[in-house]
Amino acid sequence: TITALVGASGSGKSTLLRMINRLIAPTSGTIRIDGTDTAGVPPEQLRRRIGYVIQGHGLFPHWSVARNIATVPRLLGWRPDRIRARVAELLELFHLAPAEFADKLPHELSGGQQQRVGVARALAAEPAMLLMDEPFGALDPIIRNKAQDDLLALQRRLGITVVIVTHDIEEALKLGDTIAVMDGGRLLQVATPADILGNPAAGVVEQLVAGVDRPLRLLALTPVDAVAEAGHADGAPIEAARTLRDAISELLWRGVDALPVDDGHGRPSRRITLDAIRAHARKPA
């Protein structure tokens, strides 16, 4: 799963992240990972299970891509052949051909490539958890969107637990299975993206998600498949995996009230209607 910590600057997001791997010791309370109080685990042992991605890529500028990725496995005393295999595996995973990228220096990479190498380094020792402190903040919008998509695909593939810090509610809504809103060092609400949008806690959380585009944000969380109904509609079908936000854009663009829905085999079997989308986006009672 992915948990997004969101809040304004100074709200305590990064501090909480650092408390998870004990870079900062909590003054009270407990932090548990898989039911175990981390206070009873030696810090070095704890951190071997946790990958950490800092703001920016944080790569060593005078080291090659391969050596950067190999940082933690080398510290752990992995065999050279195991390190080489792991570096190659991660480069392939991030669509960076080892023959082309392994020997490059960070300044020879694009911003998006640097970020991918930074995440690969955090995953090199096969951690069970990945902590990410505003990893995409320095990227331009197009590269940032691609990096977010890559993270979602990576999490689905590896099944790891991710905790990501962001000040951007849009990023939190896109990435988080769970969103934790912070202010003044306190957790104000921990809920699914849909609950955060539909039933925000009064005050800071409500202000964070308020706006005329709140219904569109909610539609962007829901696949067409969840609201499609039996029935016929004319025209080119929309894929069931697309979002309701995509569907309403298509409906308005085509000037129609319904679209056929592709069942995954290219055969329209259901439809999505403006009325169904309108009902889904309505403010909760």
Where do the model's predicted regions map?
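Conserved ABC ATPase "signature" C-loop
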Residues: G184-G185
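ABC ATPase "signature
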Residues: V190-A191, N199, R271
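Helix-to-loop junction immediately C-terminal to a conserved catalytic motif
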Residues: N21
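ABC ATPase NBD coupling module
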Residues: T38-G51, L75, P80-D81, P200
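Short helical segment in ABC ATPase nucleotide-binding domains corresponding to the A-loop/adjacent helical element
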Residues: A66-R74, R84, A88
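Conserved catalytic motifs of ABC-family nucleotide-binding domains
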Residues: E126
